[in-house]
């Protein structure tokens, strides 16, 4: 590797960037101590990628280009995907994030795919599969005389294998499973995730065809075909299947949808086969045994001050010259990654280098809009998004054409659609992709992908249970400019995460600083479509919906995605998974009502789609059934409470509006006090989960004395248990809801305990950078 230059500047790191780099990317010694600094890390990556120039007649020397790549990354204008940051310049050397593997119809082919997936997950990649080639359940198997298990049964094997790799690897395996809508087992597949926790290592999507969508529009039947024989196995009404897709997405967010015919219309190498699947987050359609390496340009870094209020924000306020320079360097970087990467299978190496697909995308779009004073949900916002991506697409293809002159086109160019159109030649079969950037955006200090901000403020866990208020810097600057930057205002914003209903703030500020849940869902979809129109591959984007959204809202989003030319869409209704709770008492009653409603709409089916026998008499519950199980998803609030031992943050999560569990943390109090607070929280939680009324809990805790009482505006707080009682009493008995610091809704981060956000088709933690996908 090229030696580290002594004059190389140190990267400027925020606290968040430093923490994420140290935890996830900097190499460590066997004892866990850090082997490299952030400067070492970025030079390792830059040098390893620039070294590939030596194989070509390049205008750059490897040393000079390594410096440019280093500056590109440490200025936070561009970052490659996580496997490149982790593995470039290491012995592993696997630098790609996305792979697609074929699943054939024989046992040998199926378990080859399981083995190959394990190898890819071990190396840090994610995998996509189509199960559409598998013969349907209960089909006759000629070689044995038995019957086929069907796609969903084998899907469970893939999920279990991934679970084992997750336990041993440094990066969690992620999968996409796709089944064509005309497969005979499609109803079972759509219902596969009805039971929460099933197939938790998979994103599932239904592959919709043009024939199916036309049948939906006409409310006509369509054919289900046995993939083994090609014969029509059954017919279903398309509208009923589409409505079932909508219902399941409303209930749990799964499955998503992809438009397979539309994807294949944009397949640049159709002679090599049909595209059947995508990567786990859905933005990268790939051929079997193909991989793609991704990278993202940080649009927030291309704002030009002084132009933000001009009449045409789609053309002003952006440094287009610098953006073009960065795009050209980024395309060269990503093309070099193909040569630098060591793939886990030889057939993947051959396929990747034959087509040389790259995926250059963006992040920081919402932050750029903030700087330009342009609302996300506005015609101006759409115009800017489309203009930016059209520019990146044009410059990206120019850069790929220049590389083709320098290095030769991708080997499959001669039989590609480009050659037939006399376009190019190009070095890369595809150039652009809008990928999830959850962890990368934390490193770069910007908003994720093309998503709007989920919250303007949120609280972050730091050492010893202390919590720190995080505020979007552009929002904070706008408040300061308006003379309204105060701790009280920040607390008010943090309580909601949004300024939509804070009438004491200026209207123009509230209009610009919109968040994901502030806007009508249609704006999410329109923005996705604006970027899709100028993207070779696809766009990873989540349409966030409020909890009260209806099935019709999701139907409209799906239909608009089809009409607007999107290649797929993922919706997530806030808190949708929390209705599936295993509980007793009132919680059980509510759950049974939910299940009853679901069965009325979808009678006779369980999570496998199998008809169910008549219910039997329920067994007598055991004593252990008295403690309700904790569901994976809860929502609640965090209350800031002063105590004589430090500020306590009391988090209360609820089921059906009733307290279910309590966590108490006290900052800067020492481990002994922290342990006592945790113990009290655990015991209170056990009582609540065992059916003890919150009034009784309050009565037991209230008035317990301590050594360090403090005065509150409504009385004296004597101790930690007394403070917990005070907070519960004010919230549940008096209904005051005072001092709320943050709303929590969704799944919990397994690494830091913060609430996960569902965006860009992926669960991501805004606090520590954990991501299911990156």
Which role does the model predict for each range below?
Residues 326-349, 353, 374-437, 507-511, ...:
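Internal maturation/activation junctions in enzymes
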Residues 584-647, 751:
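Short, Gly/Pro- and small/polar-rich lid/capping loops
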Residues 1-95, 101, 242-246, 251, ...:
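Acidic/polar, glycine-rich intrinsically disordered N-terminal extensions of enzymes
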Residues 15, 283-285, 334-339, 409, ...:
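Catalytic alpha/beta core of large soluble enzyme barrels
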Residues 749-752, 765-768:
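Short cysteine-rich clusters marking metal-coordination/redox-active sites
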Residues 6-11, 96-320, 343-347, 400-403, ...:
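Active-site cavity-forming subdomains of large catalytic enzyme subunits
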Residues 111-120, 135, 146-159, 192-206, ...:
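Extended active-site and interfacial segments that coordinate phosphate-rich ligands
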Residues 85-95, 99-100, 106-130, 178-180, ...:
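Conserved phosphate/anionic-ligand binding catalytic regions in large, soluble enzymes, centered on
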